[in-house]
Amino acid sequence: MSKSKKEGGGKWINMIGLAVLVVCYAGAIWNVVKAKRQESRADVIRVVHWQLELGVRDGLASLIEDFEALKAEQGQSVEVVQIPIPEGAYNQYVTTQLIGGTAPDMIQIGKFPVEYLGRYFYPLSNKLQKPNPFLGERLAELNQKSERSEVEETQRTLLETLAPKAWMDTFNDGLRGQFVPEFQEYFGVGFSTFTVRMYYNKNLFLKVLGHDRPPASFEELISFSEAIKEYGEEHSISLLPIASSKYQAEVFRNRYLGEITSDLDRLWDLDHSGEMDGVESLMAMLRGEHTPWNPQYRAAMDVVQSLASFFPRGFMSMGREDSGFAFVQGKAGMITSGSWDALSYLKKIQDQPVENRFEVGIFDLPSISLTHPEYGIYADGRLSEASAGTGFAFGITRFTSNFDLCVEFLQYATTPEMNTHVNEIAGWIPVITGAIPKEWLKNFQPNIVGYVGNIRFEVLGGGKVKLREDQVFWPLISGDTDYETYASELWSSLPAEAATDFKRLYEGSRESIPNRQARKSAYLANVVFGGQDPQNRAVNEIQLQRSLQPLLLFKTTQKKMDRMLELTLEDAPEDERSVEFNQEFFKALEREMSQ
């Protein structure tokens, strides 16, 4: 090739590169201009979330389209912009936007510190304690009709009950899941609820077991898994009884710890608050009751270990997506996951070649029966899902110039009709009274029957005790260590870790008091020097009572801790293991408190 031709080719490449650069630059400028135009308009609200699962964005898009059409009919041009952000980048994105003062109007709550709620979000109690106006408007429309269909009459009967209620009381859980005790406030309004179930391959069950019914007991879960494992080995095929990752293992741990140890949670709940807190957990350790050698705790760990023997090798390094991929490929008999994955799983299975597709069954994790030869003596019954609560919640940031419009959007989204519509498309479970889930989602409906609570080695949420327990738990479950090694390593390191966590709890209670007192004073001033109408005054009185409760708790927390330690010392166990633990703990605590 001649030199001139080479130079000509180089020039063309340079021109192409320059053209690409110009296009990208122009696109970036257009995006900035477009965003600035939107920000300058009073009728644009931006909504950010991390839900990238199949159907969720479509459900929100349909909701947005209907809301924009409604506002257009009312003579107002409104644009709602949906901004999905990958889960892994969500915290960084939201934090940057909030701190920089450029946050969207509404943000899905979660993945960021709770302190951000009080600093960057509007409290919503006053709005939530009043009726949702869309319900009253729809009821008035139906009442004006001289003739109503059967569906409309059913809807009218429902709305007669819901329309006068406070907005928060139209949620199945009363929106309790969105109450933030640290601020005694509500900051979020949710659209869905979620539960965890087991999915299974009916075709594979029929081939291996001769039937396609789910296991009815824990014993059958084990025997079915054994049969699938043996079938794979006999036919020299890669077949997993239970597709799993670290994520799924944690689900099993939570479920069966609850089923086997929830009675200990109630027993060690010294102040009868309804659950054992971190301080009470520590007191049980100092009494020699809460140890890795406690027979109930060990039984729960044995249950999880027995299930882990059916997980794939190296499951610790796998992600939730990896285990899901194995299941939809037909390479696993079962998988446990939440209702949020249901639509994605079903769609991916249907995308397989016809010969690889299979029918999916869904069942709840089977409970330990009272007749189980090893664990029946400890079986307390199934774990309740009463605390499933309302999720997929959005808060309104203090940076919005459209607060009322944001509230209106959330109210519109949480009518029975629209809540049904959004969740039908998303494949999730609705949360509003009267909203109807899809037929195949009824297996995911929260089951409130059962017990709550379990015992864990945790003194401070996310503290050093929990971190240490996690460090030794995973080698145990993956088969790298035996139980005695797990127990010894955990117990020997707990005194120092527990002392650090206890100090943080002890000092944290004192540091929180000033804010509580300020909040109490504000509510008290509103009540005493009010001049408000009766409804607002009643709201302020409720808030005053709520603010007093945590204040009294924080005022008495240190005295409670001191007295608990005194009682524990008076009734200290005398076995060598407990004596050594207590001595090490109090030495470490003395060091911590002196710093």
List each model region and its residues.
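Short amphipathic alpha-helical coupling segments at ligand-binding clamshell hinges
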Residues: 59, 299-303, 401-413, 486-489
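Conserved N-terminal structural module of periplasmic/extracytoplasmic solute-binding proteins
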Residues: 1-122, 126-152, 497-595
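Glycine-centered hinge/linker elements that transmit conformational signals in sensory
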Residues: 222-226, 267-317
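A bilobed periplasmic-binding-protein/Venus flytrap-type ligand-binding module shared by bacterial periplasmic
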Residues: 199-202, 391-403, 421, 476
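Long, aromatic- and glycine/proline-rich binding clefts that accommodate carbohydrate-like moieties
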Residues: 363-367, 374-380, 388, 417, ...
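Extracytoplasmic/periplasmic substrate-binding proteins
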Residues: 64, 114, 251-262, 295-401
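Short helix-initiation/N-cap motifs at beta->coil->alpha
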Residues: 83-93, 218-224, 314-328
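Hinge/lid segment of periplasmic solute-binding proteins
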Residues: 111-195, 271-274, 363, 373-374, ...
